[in-house]
Amino acid sequence: MMAIQNREEFLLQLSEKLGRKRPEAVEKPKWSFSPQWNVFDGLAQDELVLQLMEHCEVIHTEVKRTTKENLVETLGSLIKEWNIKSAMYSNDERFNEYGLTSCFNNEGTTHFRAWGLGDKEEDIKFAKAADLGITFSDMTLAESGTVVLFNDGLKGRHVSLLPESYIAIVPKSTIVPRLTQATKLIHNQSKAGENLPACVNFVSGPSNSADIEMNLVVGVHGPIRTAYIIVDDQ
């Protein structure tokens, strides 16, 4: 790591030009207003679901709503509709909890592979060629239609990034108003000394890029097609 040269002299000179002593410590400001907490404040969970679904239309993301009992059927219908031949899913206990793992083992013509159970390079190779990646959302932001993924060694980022299409399974209980609640949770985990995810990813629909003339190109940096399956788990 490179040494920082002349830092003290620079900061002292800067403080002098500002007409004050150099601060010895940094104190967090006490904000007079915090409007970010007012967005969707007081909405019931079902109302947040409607806000999420409404914004998904803006970000070109298909939405299905189902129950835990009907999740296998709902996911299976999307897989059939999209003509999925190969799919990778994250190594997440919720796939067992929601009864999906047994479905993957008996899905006929579609080849499923779980991330993190074999060689990592083979996982990446499979993900690159896969038609579909499937993960659960850890938090879901209604305002922006964003799924938040707390990734680690068993829940690799490649699952939601490399395949051609992506499906996020969104338990209704994970839906919060906006980014404010997600960053607050991560901050509290850090403050409490808890282990943080190796990587936190925010996914808002399919990959979108635009040039200076605002010509939209989908799929350059990730999946070209995305769907959220909202599961009534409450």
Swiss-Prot record:
Return the InterPro entries for the record.
FTHF_cligase-like_sf (IPR024185), LUD_dom (IPR003741), LutC (IPR022823), NagB/RpiA_transferase-like (IPR037171)
Q: A single Pfam family, by name?
A: LUD_dom
| Coiled-coil stretches | none
**Which is a GO BP term held by this UniProt record?**
lactate metabolic process
Give the UniProt family note. Answer: Belongs to the LutC/YkgG family.
Q: What does this protein do?
A: Is involved in L-lactate degradation and allows cells to grow with lactate as the sole carbon source.
Task: Output this protein's name.
Answer: Lactate utilization protein C 1
| Species this chain originates from | Bacillus mycoides (strain KBAB4) (Bacillus weihenstephanensis)
The gene it comes from is lutC1
